[in-house]
Amino acid sequence: MDNKNVVVCDNGTGYVKCGFAGENFPTSVFPCVVGRPLLRYEESLMEQQVKDIVVGETCSELRHQLDINYPVHNGIVQNWDDMEHVWDHAFYNELKINPSDCKILLTDPPLNPSKNREKMIETMFEKYNFAGVFIQIQAVLTLYAQGLLTGLVIDSGDGVTHVVPVVDGYSFPHLTKRMNVAGRHITAYLVDLLSRRGYAMNKTADFETVREIKEKLCYISYDYKRESQLGLETTILVKNYTLPDGRVIKVGTERFQAPEALFTPELIDVEGDGMADMVFRCIQEMDIDNRMMLYQHIVLSGGSTMYPGLPSRLEKEIQDRYLDTVLKGNKDGLKKLRLRIEDPPRRKHMVYLGGAVLAGIMKDAPEFWINREDYMEEGINCLNKMSQA
């Protein structure tokens, strides 16, 4: 089967990454948003020939005139009608495929309710009529992209952060940790911090602008207290940012305060462990034979792991916890730990890359895919085949 007949689609909370098997980069990356014209704009929109529903990039351009919906929340599809509009856009406008000639590999967040998986399979066969479908857990695909079968994946995208242990290609749902702090929450926190400085940023349109500020200027501090002190005593951290309307704003300590929520979720009133605690607890709860292997292969994935300073801060925090809890302060034991955090430069699209690798290898293996006949015969029960794959 030709690579162009095997589609890979990674639906995230913020973006959909889609393309074909064996590719090194997604053919298309577009925001996972659906917009409908606000009534008062319908007349003026007629000149622009906007259809009743807009998906993806166009939403950003016309965001003042649309009611915008995000079909995926915290990694899980909440609105299936809108999700179908997103898939229509991906398959027919971006990839320009005829689904009945293609197979598709979809990605699934860890701890996704099985009802969602069932609905996904049903939509792919009933609505789009794909020839074959496979759904794989995102963390496992991240490791494939890194050439590993065993490791600990920290996947932080737009809607949710997961820490997932994987051994020999199998993930462990009962040890998987989840935190509802990721890109979108950090942007919202940055909006809040900037408003305390006197810059009002509250409209959806401004939210996009603040996201750009975050991506350009934010970083993770190595030592939060010292950095805060530095911010109080000097202006060394202050950077200027030019807004789309030409105004210039100053961004200082907010640059590291916003992403700090990944390590200290209480900052934005989210209960639970931060990223370093989740990693440490997750590995320590694993059986003892696999722990060292996981400490040596911690792989970062997703756009919210792209902050400068994140790998070194994570390494420091995990070492501190290991020293206190496991070694009881004996520093000699740290040599054996050999902690290693892998931060591949293309980690923003890691899940997609792993999917493209897997789909490329398996494109001609009939036992790998759930085909249309399986689905017609067994219905949703055909998912059992996948859990054994």
UniProtKB/Swiss-Prot annotation:
Induction: Repressed by light. InterPro entries: Actin, ATPase_NBD. 'Wurm' means 'worm' in German. Plants impaired in WURM display worm-shaped trichomes. Functions as ATP-binding component of the Arp2/3 complex which is involved in regulation of actin polymerization and together with an activating nucleation-promoting factor (NPF) mediates the formation of branched actin networks. Seems to contact the pointed end of the daughter actin filament. Arp2/3 complex plays a critical role in the control of cell morphogenesis via the modulation of cell polarity development. Involved in the control of cell morphogenesis in leaf epidermal pavement cells, root hairs, hypocotyls epidermal cells and trichomes, especially during rapid cell expansion. Disruption phenotype: Distorted trichomes and altered epidermal cell types. It comes from the Eukaryota. This is Actin-related protein 2. One of its GO terms (molecular function) is actin binding. Component of the Arp2/3 complex composed of ARP2, ARP3, ARPC1/p41-ARC, ARPC2/p34-ARC, ARPC3/p21-ARC, ARPC4/p20-ARC and ARPC5/p16-ARC. Interacts directly with ARP3/DIS1 and ABI1. Its main location: cytoplasm. ATP binds at G157, D158, G159, R211, E212, I213, K214, E215, G302, G303, S304, T305, M306, Y307. One of its GO terms (cellular component) is cytoplasm. Expressed at low levels in roots, seedlings, stems, leaves, flowers, pollen, siliques and at a higher level in inflorescences. Specifically localized in cells adjacent to mature xylem and in developing xylem vessels. It is found in: Cytoplasm, Cytoskeleton. Keywords: Actin-binding, ATP-binding, Cytoplasm, Cytoskeleton, Developmental protein, Nucleotide-binding. Belongs to the actin family. ARP2 subfamily. GO terms for biological process: actin cytoskeleton organization; actin filament organization; actin filament-based process; cell morphogenesis; multidimensional cell growth; trichome morphogenesis. PANTHER family: ACTIN. The gene is ARP2.
